[in-house]
Each structure stands twice: as C-alpha cells, then as structure tokens.
Amino acid sequence: MKITINQASEFVGKEVTIGAWLANKRSSGKIAFLQLRDGTGFMQGVVVKAEVGDDMFASAKALTQETSLYVTGTINEDTRSPFGYEMAVSGVEVISESHDYPITPKEHGTEFLMDHRHLWLRSNRQHAIMKIRNEIIRASYEFFNKEGFLKIDPPILTGSAPEGTTELFHTKYFEEDAFLSQSGQLYMEAAAMAFGKVFSFGPTFRAEKSKTRRHLIEFWMIEPEMAFYKLEDSLQVQENYVAYLVKAVLDNCRLELDRLGRDVSHLEKMVAPFPRITYTEAIERLHELGFDDIVWGDDFGAPHETAIADSFEKPVFITHYPKAIKPFYMPEDPENNQVVLCADMIAPEGYGEIIGGSERIHDLETLQARMEDFDLDQEAYSWYLDLARYGSVPHSGFGLGLERTVAWISGTEHVRETIPFPRLLNRLYP
C-alpha cells in the first residue's frame, strides 16, 4: 500500500510503500539510515544488512542525496526518532538518480543558497517555514470567514497609486500607463460599501530600494475593510486576528516550531487585548531611553520600533501618528488636527510593523481637500471619490504583511526565507 509520511501513525506494524526523496543518509557498520522526505514530512528509513542482504545494503549505502525513490518497509513507532516513526526498510526502487547535488549538509553562504532557492526549498528548515506560512494563510481565511467577511479580489494592475507615492512599478497597458498594485485598499473600500465586511489576500509590489531584513519588493498582504467600524473597533479585530494566527500555529505547527528552535514561551503570551500607546507617548518613551535622533514628526526607524516593542511582551499598537507622515485617506483626530486616526501594530522581538491601519475619510469635501494637499489628480481618483458622493459611512481597514508575520511567529531572522521565491533589491532569480 502506498502512503505518505504524514500518514505513518495510521500504519504502525504494517508494510507500506512511500514515494520520497533522499534528504540525507549515514551508515554505521551494518546499518544504513536514510532520511526521507515526501513533502508531507520527514522520516528515517533503517536498512539492516542482516535483514536485506549484501546487494541491497550496498545499493542503499550508494544512494545519493536527493535521489527519488520508492521505499518499502514496515512502520515502527520510535520515540527516539526526531519524527516519531521509522521505517524498517525491506526494499528500495530508484526512480531518478541525483548526481552532484549542490546543497550538501555542510554550511553554505546566503548568496549561494539564494542562487539555488529552487533547491533550498527542499531543506528541513525551509519545509518548516513554508508549513507555518501555509498555516497562517489557512487560519486567516478561517478567521475572516467565521467573522462574516466576504473575500474580494482587487486588481493587481492599476491606473494610480493608492497612497500617492512614487514607489511604483510602471508598465504599459496597451496605450495607457499602468502600475503594479501597492495595495488593494481603495478597491476594498468600494467593496465594503457594497458588502459591509470584506478582506483580500494577494501580492503587492513596492519599488523600495531597501536591503533590510524586513523588506521584500514583492510580498503578500491580507487587507480587510469594514463599514461602520471606528478605529477602536478595527483595533479589536486586529488583535483578535493576530492572536488567532499565533494560536493556530501553536496548535498545528508545534513540530515545525521545534525544528526551527523557536522559543514558544513568547508566543504563548499572545492573547488579546494588546497594549496601546500614542505616537506622542512613543516619542517620549524613546527620549527617556536615550534616543536623541528622533523628534516629534519623524517616522520611526527599525531601532525605534524595536526599543518601543521591547517594553511589552505582546505586539503593541502605536496610534495617532502625525498627519504629515501618513497617507491622504486618514481622517484627522477631532481632538487634535495634527494627528490622524490610525495605528501600526509593532511585533515584539525586533520584527517591527506587521499591521498598518486607520479609519478612512468618508466626507467628500474633506477627502478632496486632503487630495489637494497631496497634489493628487482627482480625475484619476474620480471613481474613489464616488464612494464619498454616494452614501459613504464611517469605515476602517488595515493591512497585514504576511512575510513579516511569518518571520515573527516562526522566529526567522530575514523575510527572504518566508516566501518561496523572494524578490529582493538585487535579486530576480530564480
């Protein structure tokens, strides 16, 4: 019977066949240990010379890394095994031999591994990170479906920049100019006026010349928008959502977290509500900590975000940023017109901002005035202004960066490992 590795617990004591790749091997005298992987997990196959004979034992010892094969044998439960189960191998059929596999068990540099990303994905570590990424995506859909949100797919090609920035990838759309989307937010606002609560999940593109461990050129975002929601309503959705993601990974990816050496004691504290401080309070806190390189009105850099987050054991919301450093669609605070009704969620342990969100302006005249302040072409945004012309309501939304969230929850140092094929400032291959 053919099974997959993740089904091994159902076939203890039975002879089965598994299609797999040879991730690694070692031998000790008259026993060979084959580390097998099949995409669903990893398992050790044990080949005993006295049980299989000289010829098969010699063949097993000669197998090369990443050779594909069918392995037949009996599944045994073994608590000493890192995977919980082993196979007592009785037969091996080679499907395709692998010669001179470039990623050997020795240490390799980052550039070498990135050049071979298509092969690096096969490693134990990358398998664990991608499983956690998948769980976060799965749990995101589950959370928003449970909360009554409708999934909407905004366009990737747009005729304007949602945040009025210049960090865009330009292309031709027949005879017109077009851009790769930085965010689906404006389209999601339109959808919220039709369906109430909506969310999207898709790729976004930022032509930022940044080489930090937090930045990718192409990354994925979850972007919900909610009609009749004020800022505090949105913050409650955000903290419940992030707590839900962490719990899902703890419940369903404990083996992967262990494999990555993640200290789960940090994650077990991620229960809503999360702390909130204003931007002004954050600036004051930084000054108390000795940071003299930032004044009110500046945006935070990575060291500032890390210092603020270090004061808390959970993600922290920084609210009410200066109007001058935030996009045009964020409304002023009625009690202080120098700040806007917005918040960023900063993850602990130095992972930085994972969510940015705000209330949205729903008054037409106010929106037009803000667009003038930002020197935006109102004709290009005519459809967006229609939302305020025809029955708009108070509404809020946010965007969660998937790769940063995966990096934080998995304890991965650099976001380049949290997406299958990362696009970085100087990397478009493979």
UniProtKB/Swiss-Prot annotation:
It is found in: Cytoplasm. Keywords: Aminoacyl-tRNA synthetase, ATP-binding, Cytoplasm, Ligase, Nucleotide-binding, Protein biosynthesis. It catalyses: tRNA(Asn) + L-asparagine + ATP = L-asparaginyl-tRNA(Asn) + AMP + diphosphate + H(+). GO terms for molecular function: asparagine-tRNA ligase activity; ATP binding; catalytic activity, acting on a protein; nucleic acid binding; transferase activity. CDD domains: AsnRS_cyto_like_N, AsxRS_core. GO terms for biological process: asparaginyl-tRNA aminoacylation. It comes from the Bacteria. The keyword Aminoacyl-tRNA synthetase applies. Its main location: cytoplasm. Its EC number is 6.1.1.22. Belongs to the class-II aminoacyl-tRNA synthetase family. Homodimer. This is Asparagine--tRNA ligase.
